[in-house]
């Protein structure tokens, strides 16, 4: 987390000046979940669109039309134009460069490598790559337009707004969360993240959980005693599991752990690119 200023306040990342301290973005579960969602959904829509144009143009892949072409990847009978690999590279570059602007040169390098590899492997010709790149960028633009208006830029609030959230919780419930650091940080990370546009859930109220037990109530005390018992008798296995999920520096945060599980299952079950994209999107 960013270090405090001399006056005890805390700086926030600025997407308009991502290289200024603290660097933008400051990766945390809400931001990571949003990035994964846009990236995966864009890939999925891009592949659906690719299949539409593959069978509209229905141009055979070059290696199927010319038996003299040597290939270095498994063959298939799909139409070659536009290249699905080029589409994935282009749409991924577009979305990830917007989400992680300080990494855009590295991301561009990887996208170029991906697209070149398809030609080096004999799977695509230049026009397949060009068509796929154009399609991927077009789909990426649609998703970037959504991201620009989804309300995320208002999720991180200035101190007066975060203080008002704290005061509202105190007035309504009789308690509020307090940061234990010195100097004290404002209320939470992106406290208005709940206002960001939802993907499929109609509204947050439709999935609202029951309220938590009040501090010092019997239910609260039972839960606190259980937690203290765990802490007093923590096993090595429990500690290892807790560290895995701890969302520390250098991790891809809890949302990324689940993407990792999904990718491992995709490989294990030998899913094709369409099914893999669908898994990650949903």
Question: How should these model regions be labeled?
Answer:
Residues 1-282:
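Acidic/polar surface patches and capping/hinge elements
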């Amino acid at each position: 987390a960013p270090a405090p200023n001399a006056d005890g306040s805390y700086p926030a990342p600025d997407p308009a000046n991502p290289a200024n301290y603290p660097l933008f973005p400051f990766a945390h579960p809400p931001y990571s979940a949003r990035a994964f969602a846009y990236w995966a959904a864009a890939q999925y829509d891009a592949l659906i669109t690719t299949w539409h144009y593959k069978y509209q143009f229905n141009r055979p892949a070059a290696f199927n039309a010319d038996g003299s072409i040597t290939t270095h990847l498994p063959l298939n009978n799909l139409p070659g134009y536009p290249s699905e690999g080029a589409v994935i590279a282009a749409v991924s570059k577009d979305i990830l460069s917007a989400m992680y602007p300080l990494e855009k040169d590295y991301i561009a390098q990887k996208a170029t490598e991906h697209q070149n590899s398809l030609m080096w492997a004999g799977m695509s010709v230049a026009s397949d790559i060009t068509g796929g790149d154009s399609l991927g960028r077009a789909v990426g633009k649609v998703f970037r337009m959504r991201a620009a208006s989804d309300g995320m830029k208002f999720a991180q609030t200035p101190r007066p707004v975060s203080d008002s959230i704290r005061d509202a919780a105190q007035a309504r419930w009789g308690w509020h969360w307090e940061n234990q650091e010195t100097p004290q940080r404002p209320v939470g990370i992106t406290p208005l993240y709940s206002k960001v546009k939802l993907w499929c859930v109609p509204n947050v109220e439709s999935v609202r959980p029951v309220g938590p037990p009040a501090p010092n109530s019997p239910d609260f005390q039972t839960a606190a005693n259980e937690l203290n018992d765990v802490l007093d008798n923590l096993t090595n296995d429990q500690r290892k599991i807790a560290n895995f999920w701890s969302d520390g520096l250098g991790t891809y945060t809890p949302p990324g752990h689940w993407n990792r599980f999904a990718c491992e299952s995709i490989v294990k079950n030998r899913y094709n690119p369409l099914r893999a994209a669908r898994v990650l999107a949903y």
